[in-house]
Amino acid sequence: VGEVHFAPGTVARVRTIDYFDGSGNLTLREQYDIRGFKTADEFFGQDGQMHYQALYRPDQTKYMERYYVKSTENTPINSLNRLINYQGHDYYFDTIDDLFTFFLDQLNNSTAEDNTFIADRPAMANNPVMDMMTPAKKLLWLPINHVAEGNDPVAGVLSGVYQQALNRDNIGRLDGLIVMTAQQKADLKKRFKRQIKIYQVSGGIAATGEPVPMAQRQSNRIIHVGRLGFDKQIDQVIQVFQGIHDQIPTATLTLYGYGEGADVAKFEEQVKNAGLEGLVTFAGYLPDTSSVYENAQLYLDCARIDGQPLSLVEALGHGVPALAYDYPYGPSDLITNGKNGYLIAPNTPTKMIQTAVKLLKNPARLQKMSAQAYELSRAVDAQHVWKQWQTIIKG
């Protein structure tokens, strides 16, 4: 028996085909690329867990085999990876990190240039980049806070994903760290002193389109863009909007982005209990949000912690004044208080409500802040961000 699953958002394009034995147990899953060719065979045991995987090229030649053993929790653990007939030889790797490092070294050797490798996914890329055997410039990009929430950024315990990479024995294997904000750069320089170079490069690039006047936007339209989770304190965004709506009945809130189903359900229940149905919209994920920003008059950010919120860069770049809690890291680098938005003390929704109402009731002030949002965003436009990268590439 075979069960065909189609790729979301397509018409009859196969994503997977599952095969079952006579007892209804999954035995084989074929994975397909959206372009129409098979990419993998995955074989399952009687316990329902994968034990072997074969990977294929577009011409259907097999290039890799991956083997799995059972953990104490009865989940599959990758125990061996076989790279088949690479330059006439088979190679065996105990872990995917070892395979990743091998790939990076092969890539590095494929050119005669002085190459730079940047690990930008801490859990996946830090160790493979640091373990490279061939000479190259190696840097880590820190997309999140380097310490756990609530810890001192200079002396506190490092976040788990950085404890190995940034310990005393390993940090000397790196040529630098890249962060997105001046505040985090300053904290890391205090922490590591002269042990390693710290670079700052904006993670977001502001748009450079024609300004859209506030009068052409939907009146009192408030937005938030990003992952919908309790760490982002979407519950407080809704709470703040409720306070705004009590004083400005025409105000609306639209939330763009995805989240865990259970979390989103709780936010929807909060909206229902507050009597805000029809005023708060969960719009889901959009690949292009330019029109969203250009029709909004105010952006709210009630998060506890972040690296540099991309949506805040985008909102300001589209002339949307922003109110954000002054958390580490991001808002204080992007918002000049009273110019393009306001920094609000964390977890003070009443203060954010008061600030938002005062601003929305003053169209002239709102328009001035929008113009300043466009102007100040030039500091993170494509030209300026490219100059930041040049200090790393040429340094």
How should these model regions be labeled?
Residues 336-338, 342-349, 357-364:
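Conserved acidic donor-binding segment of nucleotide-sugar-dependent glycosyltransferases
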Residues 321-325:
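Short hydrophobic beta-strand element within catalytic cores of glycosyltransferases
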Residues 160-196:
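A short, active-site helix/loop in glycosyltransferases that binds the activated sugar's phosphate group
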Residues 264-284:
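Nucleotide-activated donor-binding/catalytic signature segment of Leloir-type glycosyltransferases, i.e.
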Residues 225, 253-265:
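Glycosyltransferase donor-sugar binding loop
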Residues 285, 304:
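Aromatic "clamp/platform" in nucleotide-sugar-dependent glycosyltransferases that forms part
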Residues 250, 292, 351, 358, ...:
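A short, well-ordered alpha-helix in the C-terminal region of glycosyltransferases
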Residues 220, 224-243:
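A conserved mid-protein helix/loop that constitutes part of the nucleotide-sugar donor-binding site
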